[in-house]
Amino acid sequence: MPDAGKPTTGVGCTQAEADTYVPGMKKVGDAGRYSFELVSSTPAPPALDDNAFVVQVSDADGNPLAGALSVALDMPEHGHPSPKQPDVSFDPESSAFTLDPMQLFMVGLWRLTFTFTPNTGAASESAIGDSAVFKFCID
């Protein structure tokens, strides 16, 4: 098994900075308000070229939320974003967002920053957004 900090592939990704994809993987947002679940990736794990992700955002009690979800796709080691933003749709039956296509067009480390703001009727503490970062090594 590779040592932490040593490249795991020939593309410059390190074990310490890349997440290992598993369906249903979760991260708590940077502000601690919401949980971001990567329900699925097609293909799985995320791969070179176009991907489709299903993401669910939940409150602290695990209740799925509706609102506005966006994603920033970039390669931190290369200093550039993906050339195209995915279309984002919300399915009220599953309370999940589909993002498609997620263009991971080069090999290397990709940072996916999901940002969410819930639907609320008034400007309040509950309307404040949160974000979470997933990093995947694409080879």
Where are these regions (language model features)?
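Contiguous segments within soluble domain cores/interaction surfaces
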Residues: 2-111, 115-139
